[in-house]
Structure formats: C-alpha cells, structure tokens
Amino acid sequence: MAERIRPYRPADESTVVGVWHRAGQAAYTFLPTWQQFTLGEAHQVFQQVIVSHCELWVATREALVVAYLALKKSYIDRLYVDPPEQRSGWGSRLIEHAKALYPEGLELHTHQESLGARAFYERHGFVAVRFGISPPPESAPDVEYHWRPNADIAMRVRGE
C-alpha cells in the first residue's frame, strides 16, 4: 500500500475540503456553527482563509487524500483525518511531519470539549498552556497547546 505525505496541490481541493467537512461534522457535535456549516461554505473558507494563508500537506494512501495538515509557520492551524481513516496513524504521521519541519517547537489551539483531540496532542508531547475562548463564529472554550523538543526528551526519560 503506497502511503505518503506530500505538499497540497490545487487538484486536491475537493477531496481535502470533503475530509475537513466530514471530520469537523463528526468531531464538533457540540458546536452548532459546525453542524450548520455547509460543504459549499467550507469550500469558500478553504479558498479565502486556508489556501491563501497556510502551508498545506496531505497524507495519501494509494493516491487518495485521507488527511491534511495546515500550518502557519510553526502554528498548526488545522489537522483533520477522514473519519473512516481515524485511529490508523495518519494524524500521528502528520504531527511527526510538522515536528520535522519545525523542530524548534509547535503551537495549536483545540476546543476544550474535544477530548479525543486533546488526548491525541498530549500523547504527542503537547502541553496545555492556556485556556480561553475561540474567536467568532465559534466563540467556544478552547485550549492552547505547545510542543517543545526538550519536552519530548523529558517524557522519554521518564518513560511516558
């Protein structure tokens, strides 16, 4: 099975937006704005906000995009895995890719209620540094996480 991480291409747009929309709908059942977010709106946001401001990477299996990562330098803006592909290592591969690109450290925000995402990031050495509220339209409680390479080393030494 040919699996790889590669840079995003414009031809990936429909597949990537579909992954993002499906994963968001499944993950954010607690956010009314997400449940009302249409695929058409997702395409608009993707073009206006994500493609124009982020470095994009996709994870593929047999040339099919199954996950994507959007970075604003060392800030993980988005990381989504298609629901049928979740818990298959794609998110971990993308996190490791981001760590290789930005070995000095990474930051991200996720929703406080996203317990699965929070556990995932914490398993990868991210530490919660601030609790707050996400910007509109969500305006939901969020958590800011940081990863620093020395934290990973300390976790390995302690056997975590």
What are these regions (language model features)?
Residues R9, D77, D82-Q86, H111:
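Residue-level recognition of the GNAT/N-acetyltransferase active site
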Residues L101-E113:
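Conserved GNAT acetyl-CoA-binding A-motif
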Residues M1-A11, A151-E160:
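Conserved N-terminal entry element of GNAT/NAT acetyltransferase domains
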Residues P84-E85, G89-A98:
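Conserved acetyl-CoA pyrophosphate-binding loop and the N-cap/start of the following alpha-helix
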Residues G91, I95, E113-A117, I133-P141:
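Short glycine/proline-centered loop/turn elements that form peptide/ligand docking sites
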Residues Y121, F126:
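Conserved active-site tyrosine of GNAT-family acetyltransferases
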Residues E13, G18-F46, C54:
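Conserved GNAT-fold acetyl-CoA-binding loop/helix
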Residues V58, A63-Y80:
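Conserved beta-strand in the GNAT
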